[in-house]
Amino acid sequence: MNPIVKSFQYGQHTVTLETGVMARQATAAVMVSMDDTCVFVTVVGKKEADHGRDFFPLTVNYQERTYAAGRIPGGFFRREGRPSEGETLTSRLIDRPIRPLFPEGFLNEVQVVATVMSVNPLVSPDIVAMIGASAALAISGIPFGGPIAAARVGYMNGQYVLNPTTAELPQSDLDLVVAGTANAVLMVESEAAILSEEVMLGAVVYGHEQMQVVINAINEFAADVGTQPWDWTPPATNEALKAKIAELATAELGEAYRITEKAVRYAAIGAIKQRVIEQVIAAGVEDDAKKIGEEFHSLESRIVRGRVVRGEPRIDGRDPEMIRALSVGTGILPRAHGSALFTRGETQAIVVATLGTERDAQNIDELAGHRADRFMLHYNFPPYCVGETGMMGSPKRREIGHGRLAKRGVAAVMPSAAEFPYVVRVVSEITESNGSSSMASVCGSSLALMDAGVPIKASVAGIAMGLVKEEEGFVVLSDILGDEDHLGDMDFKVAGTTQGITALQMDIKIEGITKEIMEIALKQARGARLHILKVMDEAIQAPRAEISDFAPRIHTIKINPEKIKDVIGKGGSVIRALTEETGTNIELDDDGTVRISAVANEAAMEAIRRIEAITAEIEVNRIYEGKVVRLADFGAFVNILPGKDGLVHISQITDARVQNVADFLKLGDVVKVKVLEVDRQGRVRLSIKEANAPTEAVAPAADVAAVEEPAAE
């Protein structure tokens, strides 16, 4: 075993690439470390092409092992199970920038597996995994147009920060991941605290500049390894087939792409395609329907792209900057806490907001430890939204990714827990889809949150931009259709308020996207965003003053932290009785914060009254009404507050001499008593005879029903 090692400085971190020791039966394997965060990345590529597929079969699996953080997994089996949402999102983060760099026509199956084996809590493993995937592909010999590199960019105190630590990120106004080659940016994923277009573009450019050191290091590493490239040549173009399909379909296909309604257009194109396949086979030009279909798709692309570059109307007749017709409604579901219907052209989302209590927060077990997520946004894309049948089940990678993007778009305007103590779940149900359903989810989420009475800082809207770039020029498209996304060169999604950007996602399929193109796209996206926000404001301008009648009311009070045990009671008896008898949910924090939630406000008020009674301090010289709970030879014990009894000595019952306590008091009697003393041990001395003075004020009787524990003597 002859290890090959390459180390270099990347911002504040030292990165090491190593190969030649482990997983030698894989096509390539690299251990990447960045300040004790180690990710082992393997690449396996099949030597035989899978010609039965009409897409490149690339699979990326990112997996975190709990041993990396020195922990044993929870659960019955004590081992890692299905990928978490975070692992799925990181798999997509690796996949998106490398997929467009495999050559067209390459159909050999490739699998990238990234395993986190050691984690420094300050260094997130996602950037490390992306670097490792690039390095492994670079030394694999598989046809690949890389290497790529990745960088995380923060923005603090007006300055960009390269690869901020997990401790620095909470103070950053930006969390942006950018990936690209030496010459081009390929992917951007970001969340921002309402930043300007200039700051966002600057972050992308800064990250691309800083990552050049990684690209250079990977090139040197690959040269040291010296793997021979695969002997692969792209499939030759069948010029006769290309010409025949153009002859048979150009005119008719051109007319089909002037049909504005998606379903009708697809039906027309499908009929043309079937006829062309039959005619081409009959003519003896090609007998493989799959190859005919691929060339037919190429003709579709040339027709649509050519029209756009020549300045002709788009598929649905719009000009490049025009937004599809908008329709907005709120409060569409009577029992939901907040709901909205957002429609943009043939893309539509029903979005529903639900308010819950602290116990409804999502508990997430990560390598860095446990955390509770108080804001959830889930995106569902059922097959009927595109007029198809299909399997229904757990969310797929795409749904998880789109949900996270929509969440990023809205997160910056969400109130803090102190401002709004509710846990919030938003669900976006896509009911129609023809491009940019994730951005429809952003718009619908903003509307539903306002309808639910969540005090968000501002309305948020999202828009998807596209690009068609040819030798003769380029055109940036606003509010792209599904076909324009599929046939174009860029998917550029921007969410934000009137003041700035909250989320930016960019996926580019070609090299050569310049700063100028990104500037135009951001400027055009701002105009589109402001237009959408104006329409949304006509439906609802500000969060509703009151939450839904069907949402729980949360009341927060503070008690002495030393009294928490009294509210809980022995074995939880007191708090259990409180919740069952009042119909509320009660949550306590170690600092004495108590949150009481109930749909009925009266129930919450009753629970608060009883908690305040339980935690009240006994005041010396104050008169209370209490119930006699025990008799003794030397006096009587009287309960004056929940869980708090005091002793009325036999000499303090009356002015007359008392021989037998039972002659004057019986169990259950309600009497007025005055507090004479509370000693250091918390024992309370009471007097009935001194309480009978007519000038003294009487405290309310204790809520005896709240007492679940026998009082201590």
From Swiss-Prot:
Its EC number is 2.7.7.8. Its cofactor is Mg(2+). Its main location: cytoplasm. GO terms for cellular component: cytosol. It is an enzyme of class 2 (transferase). Keywords: Cytoplasm, Magnesium, Metal-binding, Nucleotidyltransferase, RNA-binding, Transferase. Mg(2+) binds at D485, D491. One of its GO terms (molecular function) is polyribonucleotide nucleotidyltransferase activity. Residues 552-611 form the KH domain. The keyword Ribonucleoprotein does not apply. GO terms for biological process: mRNA catabolic process; RNA processing. It is found in: Cytoplasm. It catalyses: RNA(n+1) + phosphate = RNA(n) + a ribonucleoside 5'-diphosphate. The keyword Metal-binding applies. Residues 621-689 form the S1 motif domain. Belongs to the polyribonucleotide nucleotidyltransferase family. Component of the RNA degradosome, which is a multiprotein complex involved in RNA processing and mRNA degradation. Involved in mRNA degradation. Catalyzes the phosphorolysis of single-stranded polyribonucleotides processively in the 3'- to 5'-direction. This is Polyribonucleotide nucleotidyltransferase. It comes from Aeromonas salmonicida (strain A449). The lineage of its organism: Bacteria, Pseudomonadati, Pseudomonadota, Gammaproteobacteria, Aeromonadales. The gene is pnp.
